[in-house]
Amino acid sequence: MHGSNFWMRYLRKDSLLLFLVLLVAGLLVERFSGDDTLLRWLGAAPPAQQQQEYVPGVANLELPAEVAHTAPLQKQVDIAAIPRPGKPVRFLMHNVQNYFVEGEVQRSPYVLKPKTRNSRDAVADIIAEAKPQIVGLIEIGGPLALQDLRQRLAARGLEFPYYRVLIRPGEDRALAVLSVHPIVQDHSQSKVKLHQQKRRKMLRGILDVTIRLDDGRLFRIVGAHLKSRVAEDAAAASALRKQEAYTLAQHIQHIARMQKGLPLLVFGDWNDGPADAAPRIVQQGLSQDAALRRLSPEDSRGEEWTLYYKRGKEYCVYDQIFVNPVLRERMRGQGGIVDIPAAAKASDHRALWCDLR
């Protein structure tokens, strides 16, 4: 009898130890995958939000005050009431190349070097040169970096009272948008599961906002930054970009179905050229009603390149803007590329702009 009690106590201790080992292993997996199911089960994370069907005009996440400033988010958008094309509204996109500042909360284990003051001034000079009303940013560090840039732009006479920065756990390079006009909807998602993947997610999420002008015009702006080409396994990186592009195409298809007729612009650093698979997936869409048109802006010399790739010693068109047919019919021209001398100091990418109507 005593012997059996001993073995029962031993087995209970052994089982408890095994349970603790498995629990710690599960927490470590979730720490690096971004999936917090186990944490929620333990009561250490907020309850999971139910996956909601997109409804035009309904934001599907709450925006912390330190990372977003919007107008009151609207529950519904009357697409039929959108005014006809009016005065042009300039949109500019720029990969600002590691715009990190001191004091920013670090989200990865990598060593980050703050961007120099001269380089940050150069970024502000480029944006001020184009005088946009809406700015899409790639590789901005976070809320502090965005505030730093907004202050430099304000010193140059450009005020952007509305903004959104999309932060992805484990990734220091964020997406952001600045706007002169109110952001009235937000469908941005930081944790987007990849197509045909159970746990793996897009590296930087999908930025997705709707901006309303004073005359009632609406523009839906979507931004993305696909997997870098700087990787040990180039084939794996290319495959990941394709998966991310397909996932983004699914997002765009949903927009096309739920808000048909709404002017849509998609900007991104695709880390692939126009003829490569990832940008073509985004442009062609998953159905005819979700197909986009690529703009072909040029600089003052008639050149289209947006990045000089030092490793391959080649000029690339990795930064691209797509628009849906509704918006393209309202526009005139292809836009341009800011090629002032400050461009070389600001980033390894050049800024693109286009005029929306």
Language-model segments: residues:
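Active-site beta-strand/loop signature of hydrolases that rely on acidic residues for catalysis
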Residues: H94-V96, I126-L146, V209, I221, ...
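Second-shell loop/turn segments in exported
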Residues: D78-A81, S108-P114, K131-E139, Y163-V165, ...
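Structured beta-strand-rich core segments of catalytic domains in phosphoester-bond hydrolases
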Residues: I140-L226
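Metal-dependent phosphoester/phosphodiester hydrolase catalytic core
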Residues: D214-V222, L226-E244
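Active-site-proximal beta-strand elements of phosphoester/diester hydrolases
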Residues: P88-V101, Q189, L218-S228
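N-terminal, active-site-proximal structural segment of metallo-dependent hydrolase catalytic domains
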Residues: H2-R152, I167-R168
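Solvent-exposed loop/turn segments at secondary-structure junctions
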Residues: V96-F100, I140-L144, R168-D172, P182-V184, ...
